[in-house]
Swiss-Prot record:
Subunit structure, interactors included: Homotrimer.
InterPro entries documented for this protein: MECDP_synthase, MECDP_synthase_CS, MECDP_synthase_sf
Sorted UniProt keywords: Isoprene biosynthesis, Lyase, Metal-binding
Protein name per the record: 2-C-methyl-D-erythritol 2,4-cyclodiphosphate synthase
Binding site for 4-CDP-2-C-methyl-D-erythritol 2-phosphate: 8-10, 34-35, 56-58, 61-65, 100-106, 132-135, 139, 142
């Protein structure tokens, strides 16, 4: 059994779609990044790679590689799944938290969960996604960015 921890953060900017968990969420700003900047999926990828001692997403999908420009993070997550499976690991469970003042994530969590479970070929009870605010504190509380944490267990 191996545990992995992932974290990601991206700045909110105008003229970008807000994509979290593979879901495009209506909002006046989106996340800035080389790929689609999906903080939730990025945190999950780092947790999985960390648990398997395979580095991080920057190692496998560098932002200097134009092939990853605006790519769907779900496609990258599928590649991470293949990497950990190749090493003989299977996902036992994943638990995640999205930290955002706005927009409210509650209404999108089921769709996020469906996307990620489909991508990783997980049963619904193997993935948990929560959302919280920081009550107006810090960069997420001031709506300057969104972050996500993920922890996973591999066997």
């Amino acid at each position: 059994m191996r545990i992995g921890l992932g974290y990601d953060v991206h700045k909110l900017v105008e003229d970008r779609p807000l994509i979290i968990g593979g879901v495009t969420i209506p909002h006046d700003k989106g996340l800035l990044g080389h790929s689609d900047a999906d903080v939730l999926v990025h945190a999950i990828m780092d947790a999985l790679l960390g648990a398997a001692a395979l580095g991080d997403i920057g190692k496998h999908f560098p932002d200097s590689d134009k092939n990853f420009k605006n790519i769907s993070s779900l496609l990258l997550l599928s590649k991470v799944k293949d990497l950990i499976n190749k090493e003989g690991y299977k996902i036992v469970n994943i638990d995640c938290t999205i930290i955002a003042q706005k927009p409210k994530m509650l209404y999108h969590i089921d769709a996020m969960k469906k996307n990620i479970c489909k991508c990783l070929k997980l049963d619904n009870n193997m993935l948990n996604i929560k959302a919280t605010t920081e009550e107006g504190l810090g960069f997420t509380g001031k709506e300057e960015g969104i972050s996500a944490n993920a922890i996973c267990l591999l066997d």
